Structures are given as structure tokens and as C-alpha cells.
From Swiss-Prot:
Top-rank taxon: Bacteria
Gene: rsgA
Source organism of this protein record: Clostridium botulinum (strain Kyoto / Type A2)
PANTHER family in the cross-refs: SMALL RIBOSOMAL SUBUNIT BIOGENESIS GTPASE RSGA, SMALL RIBOSOMAL SUBUNIT BIOGENESIS GTPASE RSGA 1, MITOCHONDRIAL-RELATED
Principal location class: cytoplasm
Name by which UniProt lists this protein: Small ribosomal subunit biogenesis GTPase RsgA
UniProt binding sites for Zn(2+): 245, 250, 252, 258
Amino acid sequence: MKGTIIKGIGGFYYIKIDNSEEIIECKARGKFRHTELTPMIGDYVEISIDKNNKGAIEKIYERRSELFRPAVANVTQALVVFSFKNPDINIDLLNKFLLLCEYNNLKAIVCFNKMDLVNKEDYKDIISMIEQAGYDIIFLNAKEERNMDIIKKLIKDNVTVFCGPSGVGKSTMLNKIIGKETMITGNISEKLKRGKHTTRHSELIYVDEGLLVDTPGFSSLDINFMEKEDLLHCIPEFRDFIGECKFTGCLHHREPNCAVKKAVEEGHIHKNRYDFYIKTLEEFMNRRKKKW
């Protein structure tokens, strides 16, 4: 049988079987320890059931993506939630979230919540910057469920994680989407009698024909693990111009005859996005100098 790990706790993994609402408790075979491959929430797996009706994970299929905070595999999209007011928007922080989405090969959709607090026209430059970078935008008021139907449609056939700074309404959005529906994961704790004081772990919730990570993603925004070459490929609007620069390996920094810098000057790339790239690149380069 095949299915998706929707929860893992205390060495036990709970697999939702394909085309079924059945959830089977499994342990991982010891062979995974030798390969240093630990099952993760979101893994697509093959399992076996022995004569005592005990489940075991036999195979973990190749992961399309892998997050570590929270630890979830095969996430397909991130809803990057921000507000213009309460809290005020931090453009560098938004760009950093988008950077991490690109690095993790996630489709990012920017959601601006609390739109009842602002006039959209006052933020048209920020909106233009995001659209120019190629990202879709959804304007929300989650408390009043404005455009939440769009979010629910996006969740279908995807594994979705919410991310964004504190206070922007991620929990409200999650609660509105999950609601009081009867979800197949909802009775796991009751069924297994594990107790109320078990350590909290992320899990996947099956809702609207998709899977939803029940805790916000990217709890750490540390990007120091990245290299400057990674950064170069995590700014999607640069891609049309890579290869047109005079120098192979151009970092679009101080090099002459740079196609990216020319695109910025001509308005094809938003200056704020380029400035964020340069600021981050210089931080990476200074960090490397300190190592030596």
C-alpha cells in the first residue's frame, strides 16, 4: 500500500492511504537508519502490514522539496502572508520569505491580509514590485472571509504551508480554512489515547482535497546556509537576463556591461528588489571574508 505521512510522533508515523480515508500507524524499518534517511511529514511512502496488523514503512519515495522548520517534505506551495498595517510591512522581510521559497523550490503566492485597514492605492509601488517579480497576489480580510474562497481553491491538489511574520493573521486564516469540518486527522489523538501532554509536532491536515501544514513555515529566517551562487538563482526576475552579461559568472554587482543592471535602469526589474539582492549579496561576501 502507498500513502502520505500526515503525522509523526514518538517513533510512530501515521499514513493516509491513497484514495481512502484510512490512516495506518506504522514504524520505520531499521534500514532507514543506515541510510540516514528519516521519515518526514509529507513523505510519500510504501508500507506493509504484518499478520498482527502492524504497519511498517518499507520505502520512502524521492522528495520534491524538503523544509526543516517545520520539518515537512513535498510541500508544493507557500502562501506568504503579510499585512500593510498592523503590523506595518517590512519589505526586506517579505523579500527574504520569497527568497526562501525560491531556494526550497516552492511556488510562492503573496497574500496581503487586513485589507480593511488600508487603501490599496497607497501601496501600489510595493504591489507593482511583487507583480513585476512574477508572483501572484491575493488581497484578503480573513476575519470577514474576504477572498478566502480563492485560498481554498488554491489548496486543492497541493501541499500548502503558510508563512509570514507574527501578527499578520496566519492563524486566523488557518482556522477559517480548517473550520469545524470533520477532518480525517482529527481523531488520531483520541483514537490512539496518547494523552494531551504529548510534545506538539506539525501535521498535515486533509482539507478541500489538499493537504495543509497545520503550523506556519519558516520559523527561522536564517539564510546564512546559502551561498552567493544560490542567491543569484533565487531572484526569478534575473533569469531572463542571465547569459546576456559580458562576463560569465557575473554577480550583477560591480561588473561592467551587466544585463541585469541594465534591466534595472530600464525598469524591467524593480529597483527595490535589486537593492535587496545587493544588500544580501554583500552580507554573504562579508561573512566569507570573516571566515578567513
